[in-house]
Regions:
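Two-component histidine phosphotransfer core
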Residues: 5-233, 239-245
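Single conserved hydrophobic/aromatic residue that forms the stacking wall/gate
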Residues: 1-7, 11, 268-273
């Protein structure tokens, strides 16, 4: 009886060990599967971001190069050198070694390069002012989000205002969020069109940015979550304000790498990535 009882205990222990090994193996398989799903999601997200970001309108480049040629032909060499310098800086930031996350400071530099070029092309027919709080300059942003808004402000807003056009760019922090606003005093956008601008079935014809407001909106949401993106306010004959809403995340190489890979940044736990 004692022998059979002892054997029974041995069998039970073996069954428990076997069950434990099976559970551990199943757990490892589930963990590998979850890692693979996350990897595929991150790759798909990066592919979507790259595809959206690559939709930049080449006409801006062609027009700028044409302007440089005209300046050289007109012996306006200093203006031509300035345009080339601005264009080189603009594309250096645009490329960013393949990164999709850059600092707000670099994003604003890119926007200023763009507006310096446009002011020459448009013969200073509008005024531009940048007012950015210093504490947000070293925060993270998806790159190429301000320039399309500026292009939109030119085409939708101040292009036909005969020297009275004004564009203001303001950046500020509110608690755990940062905002970058592009405001113009132009023609404004009808209410029914404003409602369509950020919808996937957007029927509004955009002469301006080849990237488009919807593209910028989607890229921000893909990277930071659906609570972020663009907000648009417009009044016909009064002007338009487009507001970029981002989380406050200090830019460091570590945080940049985490965001690029689709992981939550250490300094901000509210994101739902």
């Amino acid at each position: 009886f004692c022998l059979s009882r002892g054997l029974g205990d041995v069998y039970k222990r073996q069954e428990i060990r076997h069950l434990g090994h099976s559970v551990q193996k199943s757990y490892e398989q589930i963990e590998k599967l979850m890692d693979e799903i996350i990897r595929q999601q991150n790759e798909r997200r990066k592919s979507e971001l790259d595809a959206l970001q690559s939709q930049i309108n080449p006409h801006f480049l062609y027009n700028t190069l044409d302007s440089i040629v005209w300046m050289i032909e007109g012996e306006r060499y200093e203006d031509a050198v300035f345009m080339i310098t601005q264009l080189a800086s603009l594309f250096r930031i645009s490329l960013s070694r393949g990164k999709t996350i850059i600092s707000v400071e670099d994003e604003i530099k890119h926007a200023k390069n763009y507006m310096n070029i446009q002011k020459i092309r448009y013969k200073n027919s509008f005024a531009i002012d940048f007012s950015i709080e210093e504490e947000i300059l070293h925060c993270c942003t998806v790159k190429l989000v301000v320039q399309p808004l500026l292009e939109n402000a030119i085409y939708y807003g101040v292009e036909c205002m005969d020297g009275d056009g004004e564009i203001d760019v303001n950046g500020y922090r509110r608690e755990d969020d940062i905002y970058i606003e592009v405001r113009d005093n132009g023609l404004g956008i009808p209410e029914d069109e404003v409602e369509q601008l950020l919808k996937e079935n957007n029927r509004v014809h955009k002469r301006g940015s080849g990237v488009g407001l919807l593209n910028v909106h989607n890229r921000i949401r893909l990277r930071f979550g659906e609570e972020y993106g663009l907000e648009i306010e417009s009044e016909p004959d009064e002007g338009t304000t487009v507001r970029i809403h981002l989380p406050y995340i200090v830019y460091t190489p570590e945080e940049q790498e985490r965001l690029e890979s689709g992981r939550k940044p250490v300094s901000y736990t509210h994101l739902t990535l």
